[in-house]
Amino acid sequence: MTDEPLRTLQFLLSRLERISADSAVAYRASGVRGSMLRMVEKLEEGKPVSGQDVKRLTDSAYLLLKKAAREKIR
C-alpha cells in the first residue's frame, strides 16, 4: 500500500479532532477517530489493512466533517 492512505487518514484525523464537543456529530466523530488511529498504527507498523476499510473510514470522516460544517454555519 502506498503512503497516500496514511497521509489521508492523518489529514482527516487532524480535522476530526477540531469538531466541537458541543456538536451533534462529536460522539460519532470520536468513534471514527478511534478506528482511524488504530488503522494508522497498523499502517505505520507495516501491517496490512483492507483498502475497503480505509475507504469506509475516509468516507465516514468526510461525511461527518460535512455535517459539522453545515451545523456550524446555521
Stretches found by the model and what they are:
Residues 1-18, 24-27, 31, 38-74:
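Long, non-catalytic architectural segments outside compact domain cores
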